Amino acid sequence: MGLMNAFDSQTEDSSPAIGRNLRSRPLARKKLSEMVEEELEQMIRRREFGEGEQLPSERELMAFFNVGRPSVREALAALKRKGLVQINNGERARVSRPSADTIIGELSGMAKDFLSHPGGIAHFEQLRLFFESSLVRYAAEHATDEQIDLLAKALEINSQSLDNNAAFIRSDVDFHRVLAEIPGNPIFMAIHVALLDWLIAARPTVTDQALHEHNNVSYQQHIAIVDAIRRHDPDEADRALQSHLNSVSATWYAFGQTTNKKK
């Protein structure tokens, strides 16, 4: 029985009430694309199509499910958003494995919209503070000598980039990325990368001179963080990190206020 017929058979017998205490409550009719999506998702999860394997062509799926091309394309697009398939132009959809990046990517649009609301940036800055506070405490307690060496190298690149604002921003992001890599959890990495991307995109345009002064302060604060991690002092590492991120938040808030006054 095709999907369409199977669904239609479920709605043939509809009485105004079921039992003495229940009112009539018609079930919402699902779109054909949603039904195709659910069926394909179950087939993928049952390993009827293995990772890396191509799904049937759009025409074959249309015939199999007895639906039109728009329903098939909407279903495949929904599966792509879930990270279950990859779609390249001119090729059939290929089964893929969902990743942390897929999960975060789904949140990106909502996050950027939230950042544009009053107080949105402050909420995300607080989220970053809570998140990185845990990271530095973990680093101070568990970082290996090799991981501390990577932090020191990131700090050195930070130092070499002080006179180049674009380079310093990249080295700043890389420094915090090395911190996020220490636990070895890919979900932490995806969250960290997304948080910084969202926050940096929401920051105002600032003069080179103002940024240069900010760079020097951030670099000195990075030194304090690394020193505390090297001493395996989680409390001091946490204090240094919180001082750094609170300073960054206050500085960019001030930059934003200055920019708004000039408009």
From Swiss-Prot:
Please name every pair of cysteines joined by a disulfide bond in this record. Answer: none
Name the Gene Ontology biological process terms: negative regulation of DNA-templated transcription
Q: Which residues bind DNA?
A: 58-77
Keywords for the protein's UniProt record, in alphabetical order: DNA-binding, Repressor, Transcription, Transcription regulation
Task: Tell me which residues make up the HTH gntR-type domain.
Answer: 30-98
**Region annotation (Disordered) ranges:** 1-22
- What would you give as a GO molecular function for this chain, any one? DNA binding
Recorded hits in InterPro entries, A to Z, give: GntR_C (IPR011711), TF_FadR/GntR_C (IPR008920), Tscrpt_reg_HTH_GntR (IPR000524), Tscrpt_reg_NanR (IPR023730), WH-like_DNA-bd_sf (IPR036388), WH_DNA-bd_sf (IPR036390)
Q: Supply the Gene3D superfamilies for this chain.
A: GntR ligand-binding domain-like (1.20.120.530), Winged helix-like DNA-binding domain superfamily/Winged helix DNA-binding domain (1.10.10.10)
- Describe the family membership recorded for this protein in Swiss-Prot or TrEMBL: Belongs to the NanR family.
Role noted for this protein: Transcriptional repressor that controls expression of the genes required for the catabolism of sialic acids.
Please state what the protein is called.
HTH-type transcriptional repressor NanR
- Gene name of the record: nanR
